[in-house]
Amino acid sequence: FPTRRSSDLEDYISDMTIVFDDMGYLTLKEGSKPLAFGTEIGAFVRLDDLDTGYAFKEIDRSIFMNPDKINARLVMPVASYKDIIKGYPIDLFLYANNYEEVKDDIGEIDFFKNAKDAIAVCKKGARMAKGTTTELGLVTSYFANPFGPVQKQELVNVLIDKYFDDLFKTGVKVGQIRTSLGVKGQEKDGPKKAAKKLFELIIK
């Protein structure tokens, strides 16, 4: 990041690497923060979720699926293999809360005081489904996973406790970010405001 301050966020960013779009995994490392790895070099995204014109700038590198229909998707490359397998220490771990409206007493970002509270929110998996899958409206599912039945929860619960305890013990900030993506009228401005708050937190 440059040393000078500016209202233009781009002045702070020289490069950005996407380690994983929506599928990755964590490993514990003794004596340090958990590490994050990616599992894929591309992203499978909704056309409507991208900035206007961005997808078409990448048209020669992307695969478009039904671009004329609702929930049109595209596959596009976002990272190299060497980037996703490197393993990056985690500094910040946030649950994406897209359904709560940001108000005077409810900010875009807040942090959990302990692992128990963080686990409760993640296990509940509340989110405002926008019809991108078979779900619609405010729904809940184990770790917000809308695909298929949850399996082997008893085995997974042991891992969840272990990993969240390690996040807190190693000083990782664990919380939630309210994107307002599922709040009517805030679909565009909400995520932008949340992103700015996140950026302000990062550069502190």
Model region roles, listed by residue range:
Residues 1-6:
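Short, small-residue-biased leader/transition segments that mark boundaries at the very start
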Residues 65-204:
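Conserved NTP phosphate-binding and transfer environment spanning the P-loop NTPase/kinase superfamily
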Residues 12-83:
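Conserved nucleotide-sensing/catalytic segment adjacent to the nucleotide-binding pocket
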